[in-house]
Amino acid sequence: MARIPPLAPANEPAELKPVFDQLRATRGGVPGMYRTLAHQPAILAAHRAYFHAALDAGVLPRRFKEKIAWRVARLRGSEYSSASHRRYALKHGVAESELAAIDRGDYTALASREAAALRFAEAMVQGRGTVNDDIYAALSQHFNPAEIVEIAALVGIMELASTLGAVFDLAAD
């Protein structure tokens, strides 16, 4: 049971209507994470804006970013984020077999570009933000600075989402 009850639809503040309407349109509903953060509207708005910028916007394809989101969620042991990003990865064309391989840290079937990004994400999570020069050099062979910022920002917001899901004991949506 969630430590903080997610805000019920009947109690949605008017100021969050645009955010919730957008979530309903793009995700089919308002996830428990956002209903929980809605107790503090400014934090929800900032979280959603950052999440949107890192996952939905940018130059890298969503399918690729869902692989990174999945890996971070699994490394963090977040059932909430794992369930959500498994669903979105499948929706964006990632195969079950790819998810299983990524979950094992087996990147041999992936393009070297994707493997470098996943190793970077893994290093960020396991090293608590510290990434060795070899991993960064491999990443920078495949990605420009804007893309590297996008990948690092995605890993960061996924770490936050995984932490919040655990702290609030959120059930998978």
What are these regions (language model features)?
Residues M1-D173:
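Hydrophobic alpha-helical segments
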